[in-house]
Amino acid sequence: MKTGLRFFDRNVIRKEENGMTIVLQKACVCIDDVEGLSNAFNLIPAVRSLITAHNSYYEDENGVAYLVFEGKGISRCNHEDTYDEKIGFRIAETRAQKDVFNKAAKFFNGITYFIEKVFYDDLMDKLTTITDAVYACNDHELDIK
């Protein structure tokens, strides 16, 4: 099963707070295959529930569906040039969980950093669930890109 999931707009705003870089982002995702995405998230309800809890969903006049969400993340890097702009694994690295996000990236691509940023505050509580979802993708040979 292939599901289209792609970013078409993203704003990243950084500010310093208590010596840490706060990353605020607002992103919009275009869902090319709404039914396929729904089926995909039925296989991985943990991830589906995480996403639906933090987004607004709408369709334009052409029936194209979008997810709009905002995320907040904390980078423990003191210098912006050490922060990985593309994915942003710094938090994962400090938590020794980079491989979890690497595995997720194979299937969630653009929303990998969304999962990391939005759920930073309770990431450790959710980590097992996210890991289970990644393995569920592996089991079903799901290809989201």
Model feature map: region roles:
Residues 1-145:
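Catalytic phosphate/metal-binding cores of nucleic-acid and nucleotide-processing enzymes, i.e., regions
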